[in-house]
């Protein structure tokens, strides 16, 4: 029997329409909606934003991430969010660039990055994309359609205060062995 203190948790849902979520001109509004909804929740042990609530790569939004991480740190909160992640170190070692659908933990006593292992066909990757590239050449240049990579099966759990969190993104919860492994 493990004994750890309970966590006070806030789940934030911005209800951003899918047809607007990834539009460049709507990204600032999306971030404002989530930041506004979170404002009164700082001070909770854990604040959770949903999958891809930040609709841009971490490399393109460093000032926003730094501000959110600082707010979490200042209030003693851990902040967990969904964000597409461009792994620059991996991309320098191999081609093509490595993009992931991820969950990132940061803030007070929080750390970790989980890279989704079970990708949605035709949503996060195109099956047989090498064979289809001559039919759909635009797919090769669109990371939101064909560029997501699978995360490794042996990832370290996210850490939030004294807790280790098993992660699952989207339909990964339909794979009980994966979910169980991620939680151990």
Segments predicted by a language model, with ranges:
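Enzyme catalytic cores with a strong preference for nitrogen-chemistry domains
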Residues: 1-184
């Amino acid at each position: 029997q493990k004994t750890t203190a309970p966590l006070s948790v806030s789940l934030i849902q911005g209800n951003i329409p899918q047809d607007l979520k990834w539009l460049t001109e709507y990204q600032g509004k999306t971030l404002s909606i989530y930041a506004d909804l979170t404002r009164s929740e700082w001070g909770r042990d854990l604040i959770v934003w949903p999958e891809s609530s930040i609709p841009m790569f971490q490399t393109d939004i460093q000032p926003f991430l730094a501000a959110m991480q600082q707010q979490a740190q200042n209030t003693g909160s851990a902040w967990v969010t969904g964000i597409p992640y461009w792994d620059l170190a991996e991309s320098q070692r191999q081609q093509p660039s490595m993009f992931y659908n991820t969950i990132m933990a940061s803030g007070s006593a929080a750390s970790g990055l989980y890279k989704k292992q079970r990708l949605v066909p035709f949503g996060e990757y195109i099956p047989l994309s090498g064979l289809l590239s001559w039919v759909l050449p635009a797919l090769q240049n669109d990371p939101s359609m064909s560029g997501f990579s699978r995360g490794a099966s042996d990832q370290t759990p996210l850490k939030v205060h004294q807790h280790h969190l098993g992660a699952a993104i989207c339909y990964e919860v339909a794979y009980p062995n994966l979910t169980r492994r991620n939680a151990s």
